[in-house]
């Protein structure tokens, strides 16, 4: 027995030594890892601070990923994280719209930057107002006498929109300019819910409030189809007008229609590159070697980089503007509006309201610009933000709303207290309506022999997804939705100096482009972020000003954790997608996007001012 106990004691002693060794090894490795991260960040910052062109050359706009108003990670820290952890998915990278525009404007006045090269092969998307704003900066750069060149093996619609602002567009002899138009695509679940015996209870106000249709239909309603066809057609016409004007051709020549394109391709034997050249979509067909030769002639040769002389946007150091004059606070509402604190890619009602409060209480802040790029979301969170913005205005601080790609439904709700609203012609706004959806599974459970029962002190207390909603609960829910809609209408009417009846005619969940919103009196003027800032300065009577962007900079630990998890997110989908046919990959991405939308539904009263179709444009 003593031998047995000695054996057991020895086993546990040996096990403890192994575990202790592993513990110490992990801690030491983690310490070394943190040292390497610190050194890497120091080197990155050091390189960034000396990254201005010391020799004359181009600014290479090699944008990778998507362009958003407010990235979740600083692009320099994000780049370092990808190098350290090997995240390879460009789709995960977010780029700041304002950093890009500021880089172009700084390059315009930088004597060492003699041109811009747009290399957009890894650029995966942005809303039209954002690209229009970048295009404005590119046009300013060109007007200064410096050229802009676009190079690409192929151009997607978004890539080509930006490329059209260049002096010259090169296309690979085997390439294509992929113009096909816009579409909205959503998933509809009625048959699935019926098969699962899920009971869907819908509460809504607004003829065109189609956000609930996926739960109660298998296709679009005629009203939703008519409404979406109108605004998506306007977006496409805006696209054609801008790009054709840049290329100095007619919209008809740019996109003559599906059959005409097929006929044109047939005439050149299916050669998409020749078709693009013949129709003046591009200026020249050239291999990568020929493009390199031309750019070397333009900008010179770098022996150290073994390429034409250029500095990447990601290495180009942005100067911090001097804090002169009064402060204009810039606060972002970027993404779906959720109750509570902010999460990456979403607007937290409490977080945004806190930022507005800080700006209101800061005596140095003379005006507020709220940059809205949101399809809406929680009514409760929207009201929290709106109330704080109204308090800022009541405190004597001018509030100007700058609308980005979307300021719809809840995004418009939070805009109502503004002194002035500026929208882009392609902004999607309006969608003034409210809905709620409650799903119960009593029939699903019953079909497999599971039943729910109990007692309650009133019908209002007996609420569970395992039981059918009582008539009393349904009646209260509908009354709450109707009150919310009346509240929405009243807020808009008071803000726009109209009657509730006048607003109701243009509400009902109707989505409007910025141009239509201006005609309907929902916004004050058409313009961009610069116009909104200028208006804020005018209202605050500032002759000089500087911008203070209210956004939390990620810590080193945030960057480490984000990059580590980002690597996993980047690699797993690619590994899975490699085994799937292309149509299934597209379907999987659509399902993921739908899931992300549903995850944003956390309103405590289950009331939403949300425009689902606004975020579905492809």
From Swiss-Prot:
It holds the Pfam family Peptidase_S49. It is a single-pass membrane protein. It is an enzyme of class 3 (hydrolase). Residues 46-618 are periplasmic. Its EC number is 3.4.21.-. Residues 1-24 are cytoplasmic. Signal peptide: none annotated. InterPro entries: ClpP/crotonase-like_dom_sf (IPR029045), Pept_S49_pIV (IPR004634), Pept_S49_SppA (IPR004635), Peptidase_S49 (IPR002142), S49_SppA_1 (IPR033854), S49_SppA_67K_type_N (IPR047217). GO terms for molecular function: serine-type peptidase activity. The active site is at 209 (proton donor/acceptor), 409 (nucleophile). GO terms for cellular component: plasma membrane. One of its GO terms (biological process) is signal peptide processing. The chain crosses the membrane at residues 25-45. It comes from the Bacteria. It is found in: Cell inner membrane. Its main location: membrane. Digests cleaved signal peptides in vitro, its in vivo function is unknown. This activity is necessary to maintain proper secretion of mature proteins across the membrane. Homotetramer. Belongs to the peptidase S49 family. This is Protease 4. It comes from Salmonella typhi. The lineage of its organism: Bacteria, Pseudomonadati, Pseudomonadota, Gammaproteobacteria, Enterobacterales.
